Swiss-Prot record:
<dbReference type="GO" id="GO:0004834">
    <property type="term" value="F:tryptophan synthase activity"/>
</dbReference>
<dbReference type="InterPro" id="IPR006654">
    <property type="entry name" value="Trp_synth_beta"/>
</dbReference>
<dbReference type="InterPro" id="IPR001926">
    <property type="entry name" value="TrpB-like_PALP"/>
</dbReference>
<dbReference type="InterPro" id="IPR023026">
    <property type="entry name" value="Trp_synth_beta/beta-like"/>
</dbReference>
<comment type="subunit">
    <text>Tetramer of two alpha and two beta chains.</text>
</comment>
<dbReference type="InterPro" id="IPR036052">
    <property type="entry name" value="TrpB-like_PALP_sf"/>
</dbReference>
<keyword id="KW-0663">Pyridoxal phosphate</keyword>
<comment type="similarity">
    <text>Belongs to the TrpB family.</text>
</comment>
<dbReference type="GO" id="GO:0005737">
    <property type="term" value="C:cytoplasm"/>
</dbReference>
<protein>
    <recommendedName>
        <fullName>Tryptophan synthase beta chain 1</fullName>
        <ecNumber>4.2.1.20</ecNumber>
    </recommendedName>
</protein>
<comment type="function">
    <text>The beta subunit is responsible for the synthesis of L-tryptophan from indole and L-serine.</text>
</comment>
<keyword id="KW-0456">Lyase</keyword>
<dbReference type="InterPro" id="IPR006653">
    <property type="entry name" value="Trp_synth_b_CS"/>
</dbReference>
<comment type="pathway">
    <text>Amino-acid biosynthesis; L-tryptophan biosynthesis; L-tryptophan from chorismate: step 5/5.</text>
</comment>
<feature type="modified residue" description="N6-(pyridoxal phosphate)lysine">
    <location>
        <position position="86"/>
    </location>
</feature>
<keyword id="KW-0028">Amino-acid biosynthesis</keyword>
<keyword id="KW-0057">Aromatic amino acid biosynthesis</keyword>
Length: 396
């Protein structure tokens, strides 16, 4: 039987209850078989093109970098059906679940984007859907909760722990351990137990593949850097995957610094965590001195995650990718700037990557550089959050 690598360097693995090992083995084999099946690939690509709207545009910003010599392109995953990059890999996994004969889908969601993507894929493909969501996130992402319900999903609020994404992940895994014969756990990021990090990367890698083709067609060369926000890391690994071998291209991941990287209110485990076991994998993790998982924090629900995907941990360890961070305030500023200068309202998650690109442009205004930001989602879901913050600050 063919097998995928379970580890990226020292990170990854499969730290799960014994009861889930057969389910994960079945999933790995089904994925390998599907990848080798031209019919599966063709059905996946057809859905991406005709239902989701791929390829997405690569947009050159006209006004944002005025006064600098930076050319900044945006990879427009915000234009994808469902409003974010999440739709790509959800369609892939839902097709895989059907191929495996599963009738139900279990998912977890933070910002609600993965939940919405899962709900739409289940509606399309005739699968039952239940989504676990931290009770706090249910409150701060009410439009997405209603979208999920409209599409027939059952949304289950999780009140344990910090009532956020990590708690939803735990509950979803618990559910799956009792229902895996009929249900597929559709994990929402490039993290968790093997083979999920690999499956999610492969079902997101068209982001980077399209970007490479588009930038070569437009500019005749590769970008100096590709930049993406990192929570669990699926949009970033989707952008990075096709550029890893291109050593001239810097890969820059941006973690949430929250209220400040020197406070205890951030979500930057890559730079400020310790290696531990969480969510079925070995990875950098925000922990207290007793090894307990610390609460992460970010203004954006989708980055509010105390760990990170194992391939990002490995790319960081070997120095192939670099990871920086951006505060809530910087992300909010970038969110407003893009709206005002280009007429595009980005997700707060994506605004972190955008803020970093703007920092790069403005710190070296005379430097000619070609940058691509993965604009991983649109900001409709965040307008109430941003409105409340700006109102509190007296800006509006």
């Amino acid at each position: 039987m063919a097998k995928l690598n379970a580890y990226f360097g020292e990170y990854g693995g499969q730290y799960v209850p014994q009861i889930l090992v057969p389910a994960l083995k079945q999933l790995e084999q089904a994925f390998i078989d599907a990848q080798e099946d031209p019919e599966f690939r063709s059905e996946f690509m057809t859905l991406l093109q005709e239902y989701a709207g791929r390829p997405t545009a690569l947009t050159l910003t006209r006004n944002l970098t005025k006064g600098t010599k930076t050319k900044l392109y945006l990879k427009r995953e915000d234009l994808l059906h469902g409003g974010a990059h999440k739709t790509n890999q959800v369609l892939g996994q839902a097709l895989l679940a059907k191929r495996m004969g599963k009738h139900e889908i279990i998912a977890e969601t933070g910002a609600g984007q993965h939940g919405v993507a899962t709900a739409l894929a289940c509606a399309l493909l005739g699968l039952k859907c239940r989504v676990y969501m931290g009770a706090k996130d249910v409150e701060r992402q009410s439009p997405n909760v209603f979208r999920m319900k409209l599409m027939g999903a059952e949304v289950i609020p999780v009140h344990s722990g910090s009532a956020t994404l990590k708690d939803a992940c735990n509950e979803a895994l618990r559910d799956w351990s009792g229902s895996y014969e009929d249900a597929h756990y559709l994990l929402g990021t490039a993290a968790g137990p093997h083979p999920f990090p690999t499956i999610v990367r492969e079902f997101q890698r068209m982001i980077g593949e399209e970007t490479k083709n588009q930038i070569l067609a437009r500019e005749g060369r590769l970008p100096d850097a590709v930049i993406a926000c990192v929570g669990g890391g699926s949009n970033a690994i989707g952008m990075f995957a096709d550029f890893i071998e291109e050593e001239s291209v810097r890969l820059i991941g941006v973690e949430p610094a929250g209220k400040g990287i020197d406070t205890d209110q951030h979500g930057a485990p890559l730079k400020h965590g310790k290696t531990g076991i969480f969510f079925g994998m070995k990875a950098p993790l925000m922990q207290d001195e007793n090894g307990q998982v610390e609460e992460s924090y970010s203004v954006s629900a989708g980055l509010d995650f105390p760990s990170v995907g194992p391939q990002h941990a490995h790319l960081n360890a070997i120095g192939r990718a670099e990871y920086d961070n951006v505060t809530d305030d910087e992300a909010l500023e970038a969110f407003q700037e893009l709206a005002r200068s280009e007429g595009i309202i980005p997700a707060l998650e994506s605004s972190h990557a955008l803020a970093h690109a703007l920092r790069m442009a403005r710190e070296n205004p005379e430097k000619e550089q070609l940058l691509v930001v993965n604009l991983s989602g649109r900001g409709d879901k965040d307008i109430f959050t941003v409105h409340a913050i700006l109102e509190e600050k007296g800006v509006i």
